[in-house]
Amino acid sequence: MDLFMSIFTLGAITRQPAKIENASPASTVHATATIPLQASLPFGWLVVGVALLAVFQSASKVIALHKRWQLALHKGIQLVCNLLLLFVTIYSHLLLLAAGMEAQFLYIYALIYILQIVSFCRFIMRCWLCWKCRSKNPLLYDANYFVCWHTNCFDYCIPYNSITDTIVLTSGDGTTQPKLKEDYQIGGYSEDWHSGVKDYVVIHGYFTEVYYQLESTQLSTDTGAENATFFIYSKLVKDVDHVQIHTIDGSSGVVNPAMDPIYDEPTTTTSVPL
């Protein structure tokens, strides 16, 4: 207990020779040991602060986060927790090393360092994914894949759970019931409307890049969802160098969902003229 209480209040180290008092040949139990450390920094309060941040970090995972500022705040708290944990680990390790007590905690520190390295590598990979997607969403969302397409106005990047043969992209204008926002939705994720869709999208992962081509659309009158358009993409098996980009409106390469349908006779599955 004395050992852990001393470590809990560690600070700047003053090396002193260890002493054992009140020890006699007749008594091998009752003795007072002086640990050669003196505290000048409230290290224990720093540990308590990190523990409270870790509890808050874990508790925040059960709260539904929908807005971007909430996601950014949550990720910022996680980053602060990780940095404080790294600081506490290195600081306490140096103190124990100077005190000559490192061997007792070597395996614990090795495990903590390995976990920190894994966390740092994951952060680097997410940054690389941001560069591939031209968006900050890989840092905000924990998804492994992202559906991306790029226009002159905006770089779209929507989280996706796995690689599938078909992607269904929903577009709504928010005017009727069931009310859909004026945005693009895939699964439970959405992106605000800034520009139209393109006739091909790409799924980006850490080591994955899969291309999908627009195959067909379903209009709102075909599905029962008012004022919504569904864009259906199918996976391409061709190489990216052989993908031919077809524009639906003949010029811009994007589709504006607010435009009137350009099809003569919409059916349940209206094919897009390519």
UniProtKB/Swiss-Prot annotation:
<keyword id="KW-1040">Host Golgi apparatus</keyword>
<feature type="domain" description="CoV 3a-like viroporin TM">
    <location>
        <begin position="33"/>
        <end position="141"/>
    </location>
</feature>
<keyword id="KW-1032">Host cell membrane</keyword>
<keyword id="KW-1182">Viral ion channel</keyword>
<feature type="glycosylation site" description="O-linked (GalNAc...) threonine; by host">
    <location>
        <position position="34"/>
    </location>
</feature>
<keyword id="KW-1133">Transmembrane helix</keyword>
<protein>
    <recommendedName>
        <fullName>Protein 3</fullName>
    </recommendedName>
</protein>
<keyword id="KW-0407">Ion channel</keyword>
<feature type="glycosylation site" description="O-linked (GalNAc...) threonine; by host">
    <location>
        <position position="32"/>
    </location>
</feature>
<dbReference type="InterPro" id="IPR046446">
    <property type="entry name" value="a/bCoV_VIROPORIN_3A-like_CD"/>
</dbReference>
<feature type="topological domain" description="Extracellular">
    <location>
        <begin position="100"/>
        <end position="104"/>
    </location>
</feature>
<dbReference type="GO" id="GO:0020002">
    <property type="term" value="C:host cell plasma membrane"/>
</dbReference>
<keyword id="KW-0813">Transport</keyword>
<keyword id="KW-1035">Host cytoplasm</keyword>
<keyword id="KW-1043">Host membrane</keyword>
<feature type="transmembrane region" description="Helical">
    <location>
        <begin position="79"/>
        <end position="99"/>
    </location>
</feature>
<comment type="function">
    <text>Forms homotetrameric potassium sensitive ion channels (viroporin) and may modulate virus release. Up-regulates expression of fibrinogen subunits FGA, FGB and FGG in host lung epithelial cells. Induces apoptosis in cell culture. Down-regulates the type 1 interferon receptor by inducing serine phosphorylation within the IFN alpha-receptor subunit 1 (IFNAR1) degradation motif and increasing IFNAR1 ubiquitination.</text>
</comment>
<feature type="site" description="Involved in polymerization">
    <location>
        <position position="133"/>
    </location>
</feature>
<dbReference type="InterPro" id="IPR046445">
    <property type="entry name" value="a/bCoV_VIROPORIN_3A-like_TM"/>
</dbReference>
<feature type="topological domain" description="Cytoplasmic">
    <location>
        <begin position="126"/>
        <end position="274"/>
    </location>
</feature>
<dbReference type="GO" id="GO:0005216">
    <property type="term" value="F:monoatomic ion channel activity"/>
</dbReference>
<dbReference type="GO" id="GO:0016020">
    <property type="term" value="C:membrane"/>
</dbReference>
<keyword id="KW-0812">Transmembrane</keyword>
<feature type="transmembrane region" description="Helical">
    <location>
        <begin position="105"/>
        <end position="125"/>
    </location>
</feature>
<comment type="subunit">
    <text>Homotetramer composed of two homodimers linked non covalently. Interacts with M, S and E proteins. Also interacts with the accessory protein 7a.</text>
</comment>
<dbReference type="GO" id="GO:0044178">
    <property type="term" value="C:host cell Golgi membrane"/>
</dbReference>
<keyword id="KW-0053">Apoptosis</keyword>
<dbReference type="GO" id="GO:0005576">
    <property type="term" value="C:extracellular region"/>
</dbReference>
<keyword id="KW-0472">Membrane</keyword>
<keyword id="KW-0964">Secreted</keyword>
<feature type="domain" description="CoV 3a-like viroporin CD">
    <location>
        <begin position="145"/>
        <end position="237"/>
    </location>
</feature>
<feature type="transmembrane region" description="Helical">
    <location>
        <begin position="35"/>
        <end position="55"/>
    </location>
</feature>
<keyword id="KW-0946">Virion</keyword>
<keyword id="KW-0325">Glycoprotein</keyword>
<feature type="topological domain" description="Extracellular">
    <location>
        <begin position="1"/>
        <end position="34"/>
    </location>
</feature>
<dbReference type="InterPro" id="IPR024407">
    <property type="entry name" value="Protein_3a_bCoV"/>
</dbReference>
<dbReference type="Pfam" id="PF11289">
    <property type="entry name" value="bCoV_viroporin"/>
</dbReference>
<feature type="glycosylation site" description="O-linked (GalNAc...) serine; by host">
    <location>
        <position position="27"/>
    </location>
</feature>
<keyword id="KW-0406">Ion transport</keyword>
<feature type="glycosylation site" description="O-linked (GalNAc...) threonine; by host">
    <location>
        <position position="28"/>
    </location>
</feature>
<dbReference type="GO" id="GO:0044423">
    <property type="term" value="C:virion component"/>
</dbReference>
<feature type="topological domain" description="Cytoplasmic">
    <location>
        <begin position="56"/>
        <end position="78"/>
    </location>
</feature>
